[in-house]
C-alpha cells in the first residue's frame, strides 16, 4: 500500500476487481493495482474487505487539546474511526480516553456523528471523562448527567455534544436518551456489561441500533 499525497491509496492486490466493485470511484491501474480515494468511508470498506487500511484521521485531523498524541494513541484513534462497533482493550494508563475523544471529535467534524453518550462508572465521570474532555476537546460542550432524576433528564435534553452518564441508572433517563440523538456510545469499563442477561445490558441494548457507533473500552478484559 502506498499513500499518494495524503489523498489516495494505491494498492497492489491479487484481485483488484473486488475493490473496484465495492468502491465505484476507485480506479484500476494495470493488472494488479488499484487507486482509491483515501476517505473515511473508503477506508472502512477496504477493512471490511479484509484489506487493512489506516484511517484518514492519521493525516487529516488536527489533534486538538493541550497535548499531542503518542503513536499508539494515533493508532487507537485510527482503529476506532474505522470500526463502527469495536472493542478497545489497551492496557490501563495508555490514554484510551483521549484516543476515544479524538476519534469521536474527528467523526463529528466529518459529519458522521452528532452526539456522543459516554457510559461509565460514577467514580470516573468527572476525574477521567469530564477532565479529559476539557483537556482534549475544549471546543466541545460537555455535560455530566448526575443528580436528581429531573436534573439528569434536563441535562440529557440540553443538547451537549458529549453527555457522561453513570451505567447504574440508565433506566431513569432511558426515554430521554432514546430521543437524544446519540449516534455514538462509548462504554468505559465495559466488563460491567459482559453478561448480556443483566438488566444493565438490556437497558443499554435499547439505545443501540444498526447505525449506532458503539465502542466498548476496558483495560482489564479478563476481569
Map each language-model feature to its residues:
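Contiguous N-terminal and early-domain "leader" segments and peripheral loops that mark the onset or edge
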Residues: 34-36, 189, 216-217
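SF2 helicase/translocase NTPase motor core
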Residues: 17-30, 52-78, 82-85, 94-212
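Charged, low-complexity intrinsically disordered regions
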Residues: 1-54, 110
Amino acid at each position: 500500500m502506498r499513500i499518494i499525497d495524503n489523498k489516495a491509496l494505491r494498492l497492489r492486490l491479487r484481485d483488484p476487481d473486488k475493490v473496484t466493485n465495492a468502491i465505484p470511484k476507485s480506479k484500476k491501474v494495470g493488472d494488479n493495482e488499484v487507486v482509491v480515494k483515501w476517505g473515511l468511508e473508503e477506508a472502512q470498506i477496504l477493512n471490511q474487505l479484509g484489506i487493512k487500511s489506516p484511517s484518514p484521521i492519521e493525516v487529516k485531523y488536527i489533534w486538538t487539546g493541550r497535548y499531542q498524541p503518542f503513536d499508539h494513541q494515533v493508532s487507537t484513534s485510527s482503529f476506532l474511526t474505522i470500526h463502527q462497533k469495536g472493542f478497545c482493550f489497551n492496557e490501563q494508563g495508555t490514554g484510551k480516553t483521549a484516543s476515544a475523544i479524538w476519534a469521536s471529535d474527528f467523526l463529528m467534524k466529518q459529519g458522521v456523528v452528532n452526539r456522543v453518550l459516554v457510559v461509565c462508572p460514577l467514580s470516573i465521570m468527572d476525574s477521567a471523562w469530564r477532565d479529559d474532555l476539557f483537556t482534549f476537546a475544549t471546543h466541545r460542550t460537555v455535560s455530566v448527567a448526575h443528580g436528581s432524576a429531573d436534573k439528569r433528564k434536563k441535562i440529557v435534553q440540553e443538547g451537549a455534544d458529549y453527555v457522561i452518564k453513570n451505567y447504574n441508572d440508565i433506566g431513569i433517563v432511558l426515554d430521554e436518551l432514546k430521543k437524544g440523538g446519540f449516534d455514538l456510545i462509548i462504554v468505559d469499563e465495559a466488563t460491567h456489561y459482559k453478561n448480556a442477561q443483566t438488566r444493565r445490558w438490556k437497558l443499554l441494548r435499547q439505545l443501540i441500533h444498526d447505525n449506532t457507533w458503539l465502542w466498548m473500552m476496558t483495560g482489564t478484559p479478563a476481569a
